[in-house]
Amino acid sequence: MLTVNNLSVQFGKRVLFDEVNTTFTHGNIYGVIGANGAGKSTFLKVISGDIDPTSGHIHLEPGKRMSVLNQNHNMFDEHTVLETVLMGNKVLYAVKKEMDELYLDYNDANADRIGELQVQFEEMNGWNADSDAAAMLSNLGITEADHYTLMADMEGKMKVRVLLAQALFGNPDLLIMDEPTNDLDFETIAWLENFLANYENTVIVVSHDRHFLDAVCTHISDIDFGKINHYSGNYTFWYESSQLAAKQRAQQNKKAEEKKQELEEFIRRFSANVAKSKQATSRKKMISKLNISEIKPSSRRYPAIIFDQDREAGDQILNVENLSASVDGEVLFKDINLNMAKGDKIVLFSKDSRATTAFYEILNNEQKADSGTFDWGITTNQAYLPAENHKYFENDLTLVDWLRQYAKTEEERDEVFIRGFLGKMIFSGEEALKTSRVLSGGEKVRCMLSRMMMERANVLMLDEPTNHLDLESITAFNNSLKNFKGSVIFTTHDHEFAQTVGNRIVELTPNGVIDRYMTFDEYLDDEKIQEQRKKMYNL
């Protein structure tokens, strides 16, 4: 289907890919993974033709159509939503457009050309194009009323869905997508997972959504050290296999290293001894022949995210009574009653992300509720990770000084302690002297997590905690929360995160709350709950 030959990509002195040779086969779905900066998005841009490689070339099988999820959300602002989707199949759209223009000036001179175009159009199933595009849009949550709306008038999150429909439209032979689940709700992601699980052509996708990668991928394409290796299976199979293999290779490597050190010590001690010099020379040859099966150090780094508590909380964590909030007259949530118990790990969510953020800000005393009250248990202390963290970084402090602000003891204020702490969060050496203003989104989140860990709270509030994080950080964070002995209330668009951490689901709606002790999957699969949700949102 798609062949990559001797591909190299270099920016200045930085080599992203070095003589890569690989093939993407028909019918497979490849999940492209790699550490931040490994070149995942760059690779997609190269194979889709947006970026020229330094050397090498890409070969797409003749006659095959490639479709790419467009990242420019404003590119189609002058077109209607439906027309934007049709433009996903460039050949079909060009034929349709020419036909429409000729119909406006129909005469004997252009009759033959119209006939040719009609044959082409029918071969591409063009007569069903509008209805197919409309169905795709509806499945992605774009109502029929918006199908003839200009893209310029659509809000950002809806534009993303239209562009996704554009990429999927017309059954392309090769589908390339970079983070397709961004800004999608769980229901729409589930639809996309089902669509791709039944897709018969080839897909190459970059995603940080582990549940999505598990649901759709037949192969994992791992980018590391400038190379790409394909592994059969989904993300979880790759992750567990790679962890097991790494441990096995490390044990073999340790034994080989011990053998090498033993031989080197013998040479050092006895090489000057005339009587044993022949034996030393023999052992020196053994070292040169010793094949140590070393693991090449991975470019992946997993932060050490560990939440400890200063003290254990009592049974009463949080009591919320008749809490309501609105914005500009629009109700976000109303009459919320909630009693949070010790050990609860609540997945807090809503169809309107403003609702969950407002709820956290009220609990953190950053915003006032329209009505209602809340009380934290007297034995609790809370740590809060907001979805927007810009205000914490509007200074020129180094990371060492930035984190020192949140130290509780003299020991924690010590530079050696702080550097060690930052090192565990993947800020080693000179990285600890970066100023806070220049940090990337993922680095800021890791700083905020460091701050939270130093607070040693027994209740964690997390608003979209996986935003901007790479798969390694998400995995470490996920495992940390599973092991955390305190209570958690969190909002996330990461399905795996919600399913594996949460033991209670609380949904905020304009007409009250839905509150269930169950897993996230059980909640989404419960038909009675789904009917209740529709009523609560007036759908």
Annotate the PLM regions.
Residues 1-251, 310-539:
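ABC ATP-binding cassette signature C-motif
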Residues 111-114, 184, 281-292:
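Extended non-transmembrane interhelical loops and adjacent amphipathic helices
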Residues 249-263, 267-269, 276-285, 301, ...:
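ABC ATPase nucleotide-binding domains
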Residues 275-279, 289-299, 375:
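Proline-centered turn/helix-capping motifs that create local helix->coil transitions or kinks
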Residues 134-140, 265-269, 285-290:
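Short amphipathic coiled-coil heptad-repeat segments
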Residues 119, 268-270, 303-306, 403-405:
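Short hinge/gating elements
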Residues 295-319:
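Amphipathic heptad-repeat alpha-helical coiled-coil/stalk segments that mediate oligomerization
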